[in-house]
Design a protein with these regions (language model features):
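Juxtadomain coupling helices with adjacent low-complexity linkers
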Residues: 3-7, 11, 121, 127-154
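Helix-loop-beta substructure at the N-terminus of cytosolic sensory domains
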Residues: 16-54
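Short loop/turn motifs at secondary-structure junctions and domain boundaries
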Residues: 34, 98-104
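Short hydrophobic/aromatic beta-strand element in the GNAT-like acyltransferase core
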Residues: 39, 108, 122
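Regulatory sensory and allosteric helical modules in signal-transduction proteins
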Residues: 45-48, 55-99
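Short, solvent-exposed loop/turn segments that connect beta-strands within catalytic domains
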Residues: 48-51, 114-118
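Conserved beta-strand segments that form the floor/walls of ligand-binding pockets within enzyme
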Residues: 86, 110, 124
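A short, aliphatic-rich beta-strand micro-motif
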Residues: 105-114
Length: 154
């Protein structure tokens, strides 16, 4: 993945004061094209309602689960552990919620609130390739999470 291209593009998107949804849509599209991934989605985490809700997505189709309980799937694991969940072969992980039959690997990166304590959103990236998300890619996605964090301030 082209780290410099992604980070420069992301900083440019976030620096423009504008619509949150449009900015996140731009990020999803930038990330998907830069990394050659099959699908990227960004989600809000509503702790009061105990749900996760899709904000935007980029890829070959709408999310199979646009809204789901906060405890479900790989996303639920990332929220409860407050850590990135990186699964190299989703078929072998019982937490995986099948959305696209061609997904082989998936990474869920939490987005934290301003205090760094609460998960307020997630970045969900899926690939048709097994083990698509190296430690370097995971580190880059976690850096992206920090850059987009202000978009969750309400």
């Amino acid at each position: 993945m082209e780290r410099d291209k992604l980070m420069t593009g992301l900083h440019n998107l976030v620096s423009v004061v504008g619509d949150r949804v449009a900015t996140l849509q731009g990020f999803a599209e930038l990330l998907r094209s830069t990394g050659s991934y099959r699908w990227v989605g960004l989600y809000d985490v509503d702790h009061a309602a105990r749900i996760v809700k899709n904000i935007v997505w980029s890829g070959s189709g709408a999310p199979e689960y646009p809204t789901f309980p906060i405890t479900m799937g790989l996303t639920g694991a990332a929220i409860s552990s407050r850590e990135t969940v990186n699964v190299g072969e989703v078929a072998a992980d019982p937490r995986y919620l099948t959305a696209f039959g061609t997904t082989s690997s998936e990474i869920i990166v939490p987005v934290f609130d301003g205090t760094g304590e609460n998960v307020v959103g997630t970045i969900d990236v899926e690939s048709e390739k097994p083990n698509a998300f190296s430690e370097d890619v995971q580190s880059l996605l976690e850096a992206c999470s920090n850059v987009i964090r202000p978009l969750w301030r309400r």
